[in-house]
Amino acid sequence: MGALDMFQVVKRDGEVDEFKIGKITAAIHKAFDAKEKNYSEEMIDLLGLRVTSDFQKKITDNKITVEEIQDSVENVLIQAGYADVAKAYILYRKQREKVRNMKSTILDYKEIVNSYVKVEDWRVKENSTVTYSVGGLILSNSGAVTANYWLSEIYDNEIADAHRNADIHIHDLSMLTGYCAGWSLKQLIQEGLGGIEGKITSSPAKHLSVLCNQMVNFLGIMQNEWAGAQAFSSFDTYLAPFVKADNLSYPEVKKCIESFIYGVNTPSRWGTQAPFSNITLDWTVPDDLAELPAIVGGKNMDFKYKDCKKEMDMINKAFIETMIEGDANGRGFQYPIPTYSITNEFDWSDTENNRLLFEMTSKYGTPYFSNYINSDMKPSDIRSMCCRLRLDLRELRKKSGGFFGSGESTGSVGVVTINMPRIAYLSKTPEEFYNRLDRLMDISARSLHIKREVIGKLLDEGLYPVSYTHLTLPT
């Protein structure tokens, strides 16, 4: 064993220590004891020697890492017919890792708080919608714990290491939730807000002012059950019947829309972050809704959505004027981000609303425009969720089942960014570039698959009560 003693072991913290075979045999001892297996000292010593033989080829410059030695222990135990002992060793190895992480976490709590208070961590300003405040500190602290949970308890080492090494970036690790979602405004109008046992339930809104208040509360609640944007589609189409039913004047309509816009720009997540919200405005009544009876107060009215074009124009005018005016200091509103559908039926004439729309666009650059001219898609085929996600419902309809592919209630489980510049920098040939990319794409896809399973399980178990209610009740 004299030759073996010359090798050095590189520890996880980078320190180098002399190789000692006794540490291998001690770990194998514990694995056999855990399974209550009979063994002799000679057998343990023999297995230890086989381990040293197994990792010979891994030694570089007379050095080998702890992880490489542990991999060899697992291989040798399995090859020797002790698969159950190997499993016990793997669990022992994982437990040791958790203990190390726990020690690190205990030491890091002070650093986590100080890095936020002293603005030393880039994450303090990662989200432009979060204000530096005690509420932001609460989000930062809980986010650090949750991110560590994802990386140490849920994702496997390959995924966690790829994120820690910046080969990929897994977004929103600070929240144990899905990414973004689009919700059925029709369902909210039909059923009201609530449905959670033991909590206050609101009846379907009968007036525009009440509906605007319910939408603000709904988006604020959903922001706490999802990491990213929350969206409503056909905003102007669904709100117009409330204007018609109460024969509201334009000043009354504008007052309601103002309350909605101010409401969704008020911080509601720990008092520090406004809901990231997106609304799609049809501008003209879409074909899939035109012939349907309008709904107010949860009941069908004696008129259809196509009969509410004048009221739609009032909704759109009130929304755009409020966005142009900004707040009391003249500052533009961040939310909601409006998306407008441009179809062959879009009226390009010099109307008041058209002038206002493009004035808002030129002043703030706020709206997104979905171009359906010369397209085989219709506005009803697309749901805009946020600044980087648009879902093609035609593709979702090909999928069967699942909480994330059912009509209007659609969304995204998560987002992963691949570090393409690093791949390009490290690759010497196009072939190497694509090989590296393939590997990271597989890792990214697996991380999203794992996240989908975890979020689906937590949804079933009731961790997201309002989302569960709106995803499972009939519409």
In which residue ranges do the predicted regions lie?
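Conserved catalytic cores of very large enzyme subunits
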Residues: 98-99, 105-471
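Charged, amphipathic alpha-helical regulatory modules used
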Residues: 2-106
